[in-house]
Amino acid sequence: MAIFLVLPTDQSDPILRALKDNQSLGTVDFTDLPKNGFVVNFSGTTQELSNLLGITDGSSASGVVVAISSYYGRAPTTLWEWIKSRWNS
């Protein structure tokens, strides 16, 4: 699986609902970012994740999906632990 950053460019609630629905199906795993956006563990491409969340066709909300190849910065410990536990999983 790969780690992605999903950034809503409008309302985040429709994307959150899509993430929760797919998490219950075991398709994705995710955690919220402190202000806006989500870090997502998914076994497909950026386009496939965008399609799954309804971003591509606009059926949920608009947003940007970015694959993460490395990470660094300052964030809550729980976020770093979440990423580390899923990196290369």
Predicted regions span which residues?
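Charged phosphate-binding loop/patch that engages nucleotide di/tri-phosphates or the phosphate backbone
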Residues: 75-89
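Short, intrinsically disordered low-complexity segments
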Residues: 25-75
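Short, aromatic/basic amphipathic alpha-helical patches
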Residues: 17-24, 51-55, 79-83
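Extreme N-terminal starter segment of soluble prokaryotic enzymes
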Residues: 1-3
